[in-house]
Amino acid sequence: LVFRVMKINQNGFREYDARWLFEKDIDLEGITDLGKGLGTQIIKHTKKTNPRVIVGQDYRSYSEKIKKALTEGLVSTGCNVEDVGLALSPMVYFAQFNLNSDAIAMVTASHNENGWTGVKMGIKKGLTHAPEEMSELKEITLNQKFTTGKGSHKNIDDFKKIYIEDLVSKNKINKKIKAVVACGNGTAGIFAPEILRGIGCEVIELDCELDWT
């Protein structure tokens, strides 16, 4: 018997993003192919040889290495990747405006339980992939119709601070509010309490320490 290890399950391409069980439905090589597919798509739509792409990741134990594999794929097509690190999805969307980049890719499986991974993607500012873009990405990736180029990677240090300062500066409350902030030991734990205190809330933290277990 010959067993074929599926490195990228086509069912992971959904209408508005992509989700897989890591290692069962997709491996790191599959993630790199996804990066190549996305990079090819971004270059096609922006008509740029070296488009700038913001990447970030959530706080799952394996998200950093998935982001690294995705980045390898993006860079191989010619994309210049700018990495904001540990992030919330809205922070990555904000970064596209703030840094005036061409596209975004956020490694996250949102509310899905541990074991899942995925990517939220967008090219036009403020818009994530819709069914048409997801269908195109699936076709490029599964058929390996990849562009090749020479891209780059750099880290954007302390972007979390820029994001929080922007939110706090634009939002202040006059009425004293006491807020219990329960973050389930997820990524929001290093954002929500600080932001709410910054706009004037009294915050009681519950499970705000990062813990991927």
Where are these regions (language model features)?
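Short, Lys/Arg-enriched N-terminal segments with co-localized hydrophobic residues
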Residues: L1-V5
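An N-terminal, well-structured beta->alpha segment
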Residues: M6-E72, S76-T77, I156-I177
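Active-site flanking residues adjacent to catalytic metal/cofactor-binding acidic residues
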Residues: Y16, Q57, V107, V181-G184, ...
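Ferredoxin-reductase
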Residues: K47-K125
